[in-house]
UniProtKB/Swiss-Prot annotation:
Cystines in this chain: C101-C140
Lineage of origin: Eukaryota, Viridiplantae, Streptophyta, Embryophyta, Tracheophyta
Stated consequence of mutating P15T: In haplotype K1, allele pvr6(8)
One GO term describing the cellular component: cytoplasm
GO biological process, one term: response to virus
Protein name, per record: Eukaryotic translation initiation factor isoform 4E
Gene: eIFiso4E
Keywords: Cytoplasm, Disulfide bond, Initiation factor, Nucleus, Protein biosynthesis, RNA-binding, Translation regulation
Amino acid sequence: MATEAPPPVDTTEVPPFTAAETAVKQPHKLERKWTFWFDNQSKPKQGAAWGSSLKKAYTFDTVEEFWSLYDQIFKPSKLTVNADFHLFKAGIEPKWEDPECANGGKWTVTSSRKANLETMWLETLMALVGEQFDDSEDICGVVASVRRSQDKLSLWTKTATNEAAQMGIGRKWKEIIDTEKISYSFHDDSKRERSAKSRYTV
C-alpha cells in the first residue's frame, strides 16, 4: 500500500530576514586599522629609557570592536595620574622617532575637569575612525594625558610645516571638541624645549 506524500510546507508565513538583521551579523569595517596604546609613567623604572613604558594594546578595524574596546577599557576616567591613552593609525608608534611623526607636531587642548577630557576624547575618537577630517592622511593619532594639575588632549599630525593642512585640521578639531582655543607646536621644538612655543593657534 503506497504511503501518502507529506503536504508541501507553506513558506508564505516565514518572515524574510530584514536588512537590519542581516547588518547585525556583518561587522562594519572602518576605512583603516587603528591601534590603542597605553603608557603609565607614574612608576618609572630606574634607568629606563624614555618611552619604555609605552605598550601596544589592541588593533581593530570595525565599528563594533571600537565601541567594545572604548566601553570596557579606553576611557580617560580609568587612567591614573601620569598615565596616557593613545589611538594611532596602525603601523604608527606614538613617538617622535617614528618616521610618520618625525617631521610633525601636535594640536593641544588642556582641561582641569575630568568630564571635559572624557567628552573631548570620545568626540575625537569618533571623528578619527569616522574619517571626518578633510586632511585625514596627515593625521597620526590622538593622546589623552591625565596629570595632577590638568589633563591634556593632543592631536598628532605628520607635516608640521604644511600650515594650510594644519590650520584645516585645527579648525575642524576645535569645532569637534567645542572649545575656545587650541594651539599647535612642532615636535622639533618640543625636543629642544620642555614647553615649546605655539606655532599656530585657532
